[in-house]
Amino acid sequence: MLKSGRLNFLKLNINSRLLYSTNPQLTKKVIGIDLGTTNSAVAYIRDSNDKKSATIIENDEGQRTTPSIVAFDVKSSPQNKDQMKTLVGMAAKRQNAINSENTFFATKRLIGRAFNDKEVQRDMAVMPYKIVKCESNGQAYLSTSNGLIQSPSQIASILLKYLKQTSEEYLGEKVNLAVITVPAYFNDSQRQATKDAGKLAGLNVLRVINEPTAAALSFGIDDKRNNGLIAVYDLGGGTFDISILDIEDGVFEVRATNGDTHLGGEDFDNVIVNYIIDTFIHENPEITREEITKNRETMQRLKDVSERAKIDLSHVKKTFIELPFVYKSKHLRVPMTEEELDNMTLSLINRTIPPVKQALKDADIEPEDIDEVILVGGMTRMPKIRSVVKDLFGKSPNSSVNPDETVALGAAIQGGILSGEIKNVLLLDVTPLTLGIETFGGAFSPLIPRNTTVPVKKTEIFSTGVDGQAGVDIKVFQGERGLVRNNKLIGDLKLTGITPLPKGIPQIYVTFDIDADGIINVSAAEKSSGKQQSITVIPNSGLSEEEIAKLIEEANANRAQDNLIRQRLELISKADIMISDTENLFKRYEKLISSEKEYSNIVEDIKALRQAIKNFKANENDMSIDVNGIKKATDALQGRALKLFQSATKNQQNQGK
């Protein structure tokens, strides 16, 4: 246990500013990745002579964002769960309703978190997939229905690998350098877990950058608006951040940041889901809430329509939430207005207000001092949120920024700064939480206050609290509370072999050194004995260096085969969905179309294609099966079915005349 010394207080470089040097040998592209809770995006600098040329890279489906969803097909490898096929992005989202317990979304809310965290326990009640406790480190992990255990970092790495491959296909060259964004209020454990995910994906993560800072880079890189105080209000799928930045002639300095790492669109969706369930069981009293909530497929379908309703009400005043056969033979049709949505989610919206006020206070400015308010994250499209932001700052937010893309663009700009493609731009970010150590009586002794510019290095002198101590245990904490029991323990450093002296006499120099990623190094040295010790505070993200190396080696050994199987599986998945949609339509409108002469032929062809898909699923490793042929036949069948419906509709109209 340490006792804070009354002797010399050393303050070293507390506001160190880093001007990134260029490396003429570094010519590879550095991609910028927004690893979002709901959607992710990747960007690059298109023209090294144009700092405004940051460009989003479209994925293989031509979309500018990719759903942050990873699914496992447990049927693909019954004998070896480690060889299961994976689906990523939209391919995973399409099959979510029929494979909900093996489809992992919003896992960013779990990354770097302990299983016992109250936020994790709250998520367990609403997530259709299984969240389990890792016995070795107490972290929240994920489990498929057949028992494959994955850390959130491993799930994120699958998504990052997909974005890496997307970039390589687009750029026509190998990519291994990246800047990845994280919520500004992510702690050290969550940041390290994100870096681990990048490493697993085969990426050298040059920098982890805060999402609001990236958005400000994207906004302020334009010479016409490169001066002033900027507030970035970032409400995404799972996290909320507010950052205050001062932009002046290419220098981006973060003045303050605050937020909530467990507040976002997922919480809004859950409120709507609960409203729908309440309405449904009120209209169907014979059905209990427990029956609904325990049905994974039903809950996933409810979540999907809740998300769609939320999006609709950002553009229209009223919508209808409709689901046929939502439970057993019951159908769902619930009207919802924009005002109703506002009222039921107001408590969530109001949770963003205290962090905004605290950030303004920490930056020592008033709302009227802000020149521009930038909105980031899909949730900021909600009119009520825009209204609250306008009231908070006394001005309408800037609407020139795409809230889904600006973070990835900013990450690409930061990548351009690091590679030397972009010059004369300086980024000064901050540490979001206070860092310190435990001293006598369990007190928290801060060394680096929150909102200190990073990188930063600071040393302070401490002493012993007991006579004759030959060693000290230095516990490193992160948080804002006066007692360590209310803060987060992130590291433990033991210094032994010091000269036994009366308490208060030994001089123990404790140094905190935070790099530009926000990763912390701590060292301690005792003056008289010369003993010293140091650690890099890498909170347990769930994976050791050996485990990470092994996973990377396994991934490299199987990359070509994995890619081919993934492509075949995605083609079949699309064909399967098309066939299912056609089958459902034929059943629903059988009376209308059964008299058409093509009807029986198409029904037989549907059966044949269904059997072909079934054969493929039973023999997925048989590379002789013509997957492309199945997909082409499905496309042709869908076209014939459409013509059949058009003909039947026309005949019905003629009969009614």
UniProtKB/Swiss-Prot annotation:
Gene Ontology CC annotations of this record: cytoplasm; mitochondrial matrix; mitochondrion
EC number: 3.6.4.10
Root EC class: hydrolase
Function recorded in the entry: Required for the assembly of iron-sulfur (Fe/S) clusters in mitochondria. Assisted by the DnaJ-like co-chaperone JAC1 and the nucleotide exchange factor MGE1, it mediates ATP-dependent Fe-S cluster transfer from the scaffold proteins ISU1/ISU2 to GRX5.
Family in the record: Belongs to the heat shock protein 70 family.
One MF annotation (Gene Ontology) recorded for this entry: ATP hydrolysis activity
Name of the protein in question: Iron-sulfur cluster biogenesis chaperone, mitochondrial
Key words, A-Z: ATP-binding, Chaperone, Hydrolase, Mitochondrion, Nucleotide-binding, Stress response, Transit peptide
Other remarks in the entry: Present with 5550 molecules/cell in log phase SD medium.
Gene knockout outcome: Disrupts iron-sulfur (Fe-S) cluster assembly. Normal cytosolic tRNA thiolation.
Record bears the keyword Metal-binding: no
Chemical reaction(s) catalysed: ATP + H2O = ADP + phosphate + H(+)
Localization terms from the record: Mitochondrion matrix
SUPFAM superfamilies named in the record: Actin-like ATPase domain, Heat shock protein 70kD (HSP70), C-terminal subdomain, Heat shock protein 70kD (HSP70), peptide-binding domain
Subunit structure comment from the entry: Interacts with the Fe/S cluster assembly proteins ISU1, MGE1, GRX5 and JAC1.
Species assigned in the record: Saccharomyces cerevisiae (strain ATCC 204508 / S288c) (Baker's yeast)
GO biological process, one term: [2Fe-2S] cluster assembly
